Amino acid sequence: MNQSSLLAEFGDPITRVENALQALREGRGVLLLDDEDRENEGDIIYAVESLTTVQMALMIRECSGIVCLCLTEAQADRLALPLMVVNNNSANQTAFTVSIEAKHGVTTGVSAQDRVTTIKTAANPQAKPEDLARPGHVFPLRARAGGVLARRGHTEGTVDLMQMAGLQPAGVLCELTNPDGSMAKTPEIIAFGKLHNMPVLTIEDMVQYRIQFDLKLA
């Protein structure tokens, strides 16, 4: 069965997006899948403003361990976060910046609590470059202007979801893995979502939603 058939039990694309937005407003996580011919992976996504240590611990335990903070270009510029490399030749052009750590309120920076502290420090609209040390254990990503209509990536999907939910435009993501360390695919992602009360949606759902409602996002 393909992705669309497997997700049909969660409703049509518009319903799936609306369920995800409501979950984020309630402080719950969502699972976002990209296209089957792209990475074909699912990321756990949480809103920064409601992110808890328990949620971060779940991400570290159940995912790849590379916890990323998705930011707008404006916030990344405000923090003076340059791209990790000048010449990005990765397959999907993922816009990693230099990694970061909060300068205050953390120990080694690697614990769930420390990562939450770093993330909330960086996402604060009043944050300054000097609030952060570089490198660190959190990996910021710059979301492309135009969101999923410009790039069909998890980074843009995360920031779009936050804006669509009326939340601060910053979210965290991490790729869901199976217990054996392999990448979770659609059937495993759906099972995980049911177990943890997380709505499942796709980038394509978001594209359809934005086009249907003519959503102009930053």
Curated annotation (Swiss-Prot):
UniProt subunit comment: Homodimer.
Alphabetized Pfam families for the sequence: DHBP_synthase
Protein species of origin: Vibrio cholerae serotype O1 (strain ATCC 39541 / Classical Ogawa 395 / O395)
Name of the protein described by the UniProt record: 3,4-dihydroxy-2-butanone 4-phosphate synthase
Catalytic activity: D-ribulose 5-phosphate = (2S)-2-hydroxy-3-oxobutyl phosphate + formate + H(+)
Assigned protein family: Belongs to the DHBP synthase family.
Feature type site, description Essential for catalytic activity: H137, E175
Keyword Transmembrane helix: no
GO CC field: cytosol
Binding site for Mg(2+) 1: E39
Pathway: Cofactor biosynthesis; riboflavin biosynthesis; 2-hydroxy-3-oxobutyl phosphate from D-ribulose 5-phosphate: step 1/1
Keyword Magnesium (UniProt): yes
Top-level lineage group: Bacteria
Signal peptide annotation: none
Known function: Catalyzes the conversion of D-ribulose 5-phosphate to formate and 3,4-dihydroxy-2-butanone 4-phosphate.
Residues in coiled coil: none
Keywords, alphabetical: Lyase, Magnesium, Manganese, Metal-binding, Riboflavin biosynthesis
NCBIfam families on file: ribB
Annotated residues for binding of Mg(2+) 2: E39, H154
Record EC number: 4.1.99.12
